[in-house]
Regions:
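A short beta-strand element within the Helicase C-terminal
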Residues: 31-36, 207-231, 258-263
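Residues immediately C-terminal
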Residues: 42-46, 216, 251
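Conserved segment of the helicase C-terminal RecA-like domain
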Residues: 61-77, 224, 231-278
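Conserved C-terminal RecA-like helicase domain
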Residues: 1-15, 24-27, 108-117, 122-209, ...
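SF2 helicase catalytic motif II
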Residues: 20-23, 27-68
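Structural recognition of the conserved hydrophobic beta-strand(s) that form the central parallel beta-sheet
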Residues: 16-19, 36, 67-74, 207-210
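C-terminal accessory/interaction regions of large nucleic acid-associated machines
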Residues: 301-461
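Interdomain hinge/linker at the junction between the two RecA-like core domains of SF2 helicases
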Residues: 78-123
């Protein structure tokens, strides 16, 4: 039986297909015969610290349950010393490729790069993947390609109509789908991104403009790859990422020779060592929220010293801290002390089911004050009250109506649509449920500690 989430009943034989978050939250996992982790380089925290900590937690949890494991990843130079001995495994490095890659430099006058790209798209034959630095750049390229659209491109007109009706007709993706140009970046809903990949592989979309999201585990049938930018956002990519991008050209049994057109010099040839925080436990790359999940005998001496203050304190049990995966112990304890010292605050958080406005605002203010430490806007949100407003708006307003309301205030439809989608991806689908349940558990722990059962909350429904 295929199991993708914890609500499914298990059979005698099961295949689990889980995201790292679902793997961490999955209760009572049975013994596992074989655990496979694809793209294991994401264990390294240098690109995305928060997601890497979650993946390390999932890796640790599953290795405890699995008889065997198999980690896969491209272009890896080595793994940390001692890792094979600790986990009883062997690292095998290979340069084998199923297709031949032709690297073709592209010269463009300064300021005329986009014009040269459009000319190149007229010159190439076959399905063409275009890599660029950001969603904004992707939209710009899609728009220009759509303006130069050929009547020979089949496109996906029915999909374009549906997207226009449910999101907004002026979103660049709509123009692209009509003109045979797909788009793929991290702000898009996964279903729409997969729709574009499907249309590209079926030949309905001869061009697919993407950011770095497409190189992470998405299979395409591209004869050509055009590497237009040498950056991801504002940071220059390394040789590892460059290799991953150019590796999207060609496809075994489909295109045996892949053409890679590059607008910039390739980076210096240096492949990475993958850091694995759950093993190294380096203070600079391993969060305390990860360390607190490890069994004591798996902790290094320096890690035990880091965790000692949390085991000595009495305001919040280690069990509660561990249940709140991904939330730093010091932040949880700070909130626990705050609630214990201000009983009136507990009353504002003591609700069950659906909150009213004042309860929702109290929760969002608490989340923002204690758990959010990133500077500036986070997923389109700038404060606790802003978060509460946007969640309340989502509860009572269809997505298309939300977009229309924002556009009436003035603004670019592309930016408004994608900012709204980024909010949904970051908050309702990821951060908010996890952080809200963290507040709920801490609130209940303090209410019980103060012998106030009437102030116990229940946010799950």
């Amino acid at each position: 039986k295929l199991i993708t989430h914890a609500s499914q009943a298990l059979e005698e034989k099961n295949v689990f297909v889980l995201t790292q978050e679902r793997a961490v939250d999955f209760p009572n996992l049975p013994s596992i015969d074989l655990f496979v982790l694809d793209e294991f380089y994401k264990l390294d925290p240098r690109e995305d610290m928060q997601r890497a900590m979650t993946l390390n937690h999932a890796f640790y949890k599953l290795t405890k349950k699995a008889r065997q494991f198999y980690l896969l990843g491209p272009n890896i130079q080595s793994i940390p010393d001692g890792f094979p001995e600790r986990f009883k495994c062997q690292f095998i490095r290979t340069d084998f490729a199923t297709v031949v890659t032709e690297l073709i430099p592209v010269r463009a006058k300064k300021g005329k790069e986009l014009d040269r790209l459009l000319d190149l798209c007229d010159e190439v034959n076959g399905s063409t993947l275009i890599f660029c630095a950001s969603p904004k750049k992707a939209r710009q390229i899609v728009e220009k390609l759509a303006e130069k659209s050929s009547t020979q491109r089949e496109g996906m007109p029915e999909a374009a109509t549906w997207v226009g009706e449910n999101y907004h007709p002026e979103w660049t993706l709509v123009k692209g789908l009509k003109s045979g140009v797909g788009m793929h970046h991290g702000r898009m809903p996964r279903a729409l991104a997969q729709l574009c990949v499907k249309g590209f592989n079926e030949g309905k979309l001869p061009f697919l403009v993407c950011t770095s999201t497409l190189i992470e585990g998405v299979n395409t049938q591209a004869k050509n790859v055009i590497i237009f930018d040498n950056k991801i956002a504002k940071k220059k990519y390394d040789f590892f990422t460059f290799n991953n991008i150019r590796g999207r050209s060609g496809r075994m049994f489909k295109h045996f020779i892949g053409n890679v057109y590059v607008f910039h010099e390739p980076p210096q040839e240096e492949l990475p060592l993958v850091e694995v925080p759950v093993y190294s436990q380096d203070e600079g790359t391993t969060s305390e929220s990860l360390l607190i999940q490890l069994d004591e005998y798996d902790l290094q001496r320096k890690s035990r010293e880091r965790l000692e203050p949390y085991y000595r304190q009495h305001i919040l049990s280690i069990d509660v801290i561990r249940q709140n995966t991904g939330i730093e112990p010091r932040d949880q304890i700070a909130l626990a002390h705050y609630l214990a010292e201000k009983p009136l605050k507990i009353q504002k958080l003591a609700w069950s089911g659906y909150p009213d406005w004042s309860q929702l605002r109290a929760l969002c203010d608490t989340i923002w004050h204690f758990f959010i430490h990133e500077p500036g806007r986070v997923g389109g949100v700038s404060s606790g009250i802003h978060l509460a407003y946007k969640i309340k708006q989502m509860r009572g307003t269809p997505f298309r109506s939300m977009i229309e309301l924002e556009i009436k205030k003035g603004g670019d439809p592309d930016e408004i649509v994608e900012t709204a989608l980024e909010f949904i991806r970051q908050w309702p689908q990821y951060r908010f449920p996890r952080l809200a349940m963290g507040v709920c558990r801490i609130q209940n722990a303090i209410a019980n500690k103060m012998n106030m059962p009437n102030l116990v909350a229940e946010y799950s429904f």
